[in-house]
Amino acid sequence: MAAGGFKEFVAGETLDQDEINDYLMQGMLVFANSAARTSAIASPVEGQFSFLKDSDGVEFYDGSGWVEYSGAPPLFDFLVVAGGGAGGSRLNRSGSGGGAGGYRNSITGELTGGSATAEPSLFLPSGSFTVTVGAGGTGGAPSTRGSESRFAQILSYGGGKGSGLDAGAVYSAGDGGSGAGEGGDAGGIGRALLLQGSNGGTDIFDAASGGGGGAGVVGGNSTGVVSSSGTGGAGGAGLSSSITGSAVTRGGGGGGGARNTGGAGGTGGGGAGAGGAGTGSAATVNTGGGGGGSGYNTSGAGGNGGSGIVVIKYPDSITLTIGGGLTSSTATAGGFKTTTFTAGTDTVSF
């Protein structure tokens, strides 16, 4: 009967029976199977450990029976992107670009929101947790911010709404995961919350608005010297992640609208801003991109924000039970499972 512990003896030292049993109790006893263990240990003591070769499992005696020892809770990596804010819509002005949804990433070597170093992975004990995929904001006057996404205690804030003007009421650029751009006289840029993204860009005059902030880069400022030749600010760029096995960029800000030329949508699904009297472009679904701002002097709405996404990566020994309110898919590779949630909210257990 082998033991995992050891003692270094000195010349002349002896051990009595009780001391031998004490040392064996502190070691890891190795057996072919549970039957061999029962034969060897007729009266196990609480706290005693053993290793069974047939199952490659470690068990401990809890005072009434042998219990599998699972060690530390499993480690989950995550990418949690909230819904992007919608672009703004402004009569006699141009609408600003919506901000990207908050972006939180734990993959080593990649970046999280605001181009910061990736967050730590998350230990989760067996049980249940909530997953929510945030919807994108809706373009209009006023437009709306994106909705939050969640994985357990990891929460990403929705992107800020673009600035707007409706029936004389001015709606300022919204704060959010990433902030919306500034539009005309609507009170400044939207700002990123808790380092989950970037601030929006500024405008230089009322006919060309700033771009929404992206997950990785601040929204662009509008440019030009007179209102008739202005260009809306480009949406800020998003960030790339390979958590699914392929590099995908998400979290682009929406482009600002303008009297002349709308700003480009940010890399990572941001919608383009409109020029002239056009309607802002919608962001790409499941990127958390911001919607593009509307053009000048138009009743057209800003573009809708893109819905968010939640991706988790965990050991392939774990099997998740996913509630029916979630839309998901799972792939297995290299000893890990990767589950991607694209819509809904519900409880997940394992």
Predicted region positions:
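Short beta-strand segments and strand-loop junctions that repeat across beta-rich extracellular domains
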Residues: 56-64
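Short, intrinsically disordered N-terminal pre-domain segments
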Residues: 1-22
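Surface-exposed loop/turn positions
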Residues: 13, 45-48, 127-128, 308
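A generic structural motif
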Residues: 55-56, 345
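Extracellular/surface-exposed low-complexity repeats and stalk/linker segments enriched in Gly/Pro
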Residues: 15-49, 53-55, 70
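Tryptophan-rich substrate-binding surfaces of secreted polymer-degrading and adhesive proteins
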Residues: 63-71
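Bacterial Sec-dependent N-terminal signal peptides
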Residues: 3, 58, 82-86
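Low-complexity, glycine/proline-biased repetitive segments and flexible coils/loops
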Residues: 75-350
